[in-house]
């Protein structure tokens, strides 16, 4: 972006100056509305989410057999919700800032099949596509036992079709493993940030991995192009997919059930704050949408991004959405949080969700490494750097009197609050790689 344009952007949006300086930044969204006001802009409804629930239930018998690690939950891919009191104390000590309320962790990092939040959206979209093809071919009805999809005739049928996706790693992992299991030919276009072990794991499942020297945006574009030339190839579009988004949104109702099981209350007197790491936006956007449908105006969602890849904060704050990238303002999009290394946010998610999100913040790679180490020490839970992005959120909220006033929170409401950090990945990181992460914390 040329200087004059940049200066006028900063004049209009002074916060951009802090982003450019790679400062850890927090922006509480003045444009938040109630669910009732914000919902029409999403373009999706509660019924769409119910349909996704139903589809995943139809596939549960198949998943339970195809992936024995899901058998215990009857083929439902869901993660644990745990309290992390020792980590809460450690954060308070390290940052000299109390966290009022209780700190919880949602362990999507340990979801079965692919060990990340992408096991929600990625797997769902592959299943939805497989179902559509099988229904259209007359090989399946909605009332069938879907475990029949494991038979050789279905494998044969699906092998005529292929799937392509662009990814920094975790989405590719979930889509690759699922597609290969069903019988699709699958190609994952991986950006320069993708970890070597993720590529190796995909190849071990018979997935074709195409590697790029450039970032996520290029990998997605190339994947899109390659798929266009083949009528039997379906491209999963992480930047714009409503199907992926709905796969993530199912998490809302499920979390509500987990809260009920644990006797946790969410209402006006007991607010819920949720902190979601954000790359291109589909995962956190879908989850936040589901949470809003489940808990209404009593849940407050925040997106967390690396200082080097603040694409969603930049897009929503300036109102330019996918018309601006972090590279346009001179930020390099290079971060240890490979899952969040995205320079241009999803325009669909930004426009759909900007009224339903309470805020956005950035944190440095070093902060992620520090918290990664503390969590391993205090709670024995090991995550990848991206998954710690949410962990900085509770203190930003508790430290901001202006945010608390904007929403009229009393001291008592904050004492009764639940702070939920969404851990997005790390359950399948190889030991030696994890040791390198741990060595970088202070």
UniProtKB/Swiss-Prot annotation:
EC number: 4.3.1.18
UniProt superkingdom: Bacteria
Database matches in Pfam families: PALP (PF00291)
GO molecular function, one term: pyridoxal phosphate binding
Keyword terms of this UniProt record: Lyase, Pyridoxal phosphate
Group of enzyme by EC: lyase
Modification sites for N6-(pyridoxal phosphate)lysine: 118
Gene3D superfamilies, sorted: 3.40.50.1100
InterPro entries listed in its UniProt record: D_Ser_am_lyase (IPR011780), Ser/Thr_Dehydratase (IPR050147), Ser/Thr_deHydtase_PyrdxlP-BS (IPR000634), TrpB-like_PALP (IPR001926), TrpB-like_PALP_sf (IPR036052)
Cofactor(s) named in the record: pyridoxal 5'-phosphate
Gene Ontology biological process terms from the UniProt entry: D-serine catabolic process; isoleucine biosynthetic process
Family: Belongs to the serine/threonine dehydratase family. DsdA subfamily.
Subunit structure: Monomer.
PANTHER family according to UniProt: D-SERINE DEHYDRATASE, THREONINE DEHYDRATASE, MITOCHONDRIAL-RELATED
Name of protein: D-serine dehydratase
